[in-house]
Amino acid sequence: MSRGGSPGCGRRIAEELRLAEDARLRLALLGRCIVKGSPAQVRKELRAELKAIDAEWRPVIARESLRKELDAIDAEWQHAITFWHISRAIIGSIELSKELDAIDAEWRPVIVRESLRKELKAIDAEWRPAIRLESAYRAIIGSIELSKELKAIDAETQHAVELRRALRTIEGRIELSRELKAIDAEWAPRIAQAKEIAQARESLRKELNDIDAEWAPKIAQAKEIAQAKAELAAATDALKRAADKLQALGKMDTTSTPGTDLIGVVTTAVTTTLAGTQPAPGTDLVGVATPSTALGQPAPSTALTSVAAEVATPSTALGV
């Protein structure tokens, strides 16, 4: 195997060239000395120079001889090395082949499954219409057969089903009756209490209705009396305002005394003042102040007397 081309080879060649150049220069110098000196002196110097050159070139010569030996060894072992490389390549290829065979053996089922899956997909795609048609046909036949079987089962078990339904209905009614009885037993006291309360309310309502029927005339009379009192109070206020107005105008020519009738005094004053301008003003005042017109009750003098007694004396009411 050759060792040329290494990084140290260039440096070694440069060193050898430098040594060769030095030897050439020395030989040239030695030649000049030979021309000038004696033969003995020249031989001595030449021998010394050659020894120096030999000593200097000995490593180079040794390296060169070693290189030649190595080249001879390389040439001798070249076939063995080539064979070794070939054997290594063969061994590597054999190992690689074994690894590939192992990988193939490992992945063969996957590859087979994948190829088989692709084939099955192709077959499915090709036979899918026929498969669908056959599936639909089988489904129709199966549904028809199932319908027949179900009808036969229904016809066979119809009586049992009806009997079971009736039994369940009876059981449900019995359970419901028990629950209702339990509820009735639980709520019986409350229902009785509610009935008693309802009866008490009914009797109380009847009593209240009787009381209302008994007190209705009195209540109506009390309402009428209250209304009459309100109307009398309004009439009294109106008469008082009229008397005050007449008194302010100086048209009151009658001195009111405790025994003087308030209505008569006011009526006379109004009649005297407004005579000829208004139609019967005294009549209007009398109509307003008359208790028989306002209340629709008899004995107006008694009502007016009671009002006058409540207001105080006529002179106090008129402010004179």
From Swiss-Prot:
Cellular compartments annotated: Secreted
Name of the coding gene: aaaP
Phylogenetic classification of the source organism: Bacteria, Pseudomonadati, Pseudomonadota, Alphaproteobacteria, Rickettsiales
Signal peptide range: 1-28
Residue ranges the record marks as coiled coil: 191-251
Record-level GO BP terms: biological process involved in interaction with host
Molecular functions (GO terms): actin filament binding
Predominant location: secreted
Protein species of origin: Anaplasma marginale (strain Virginia)
Name of this chain's protein: Appendage-associated protein
Record function comment: Associates with actin filament appendages that are formed in the inclusion appendages of the parasitophorous vacuole during infection of the host erythrocyte.
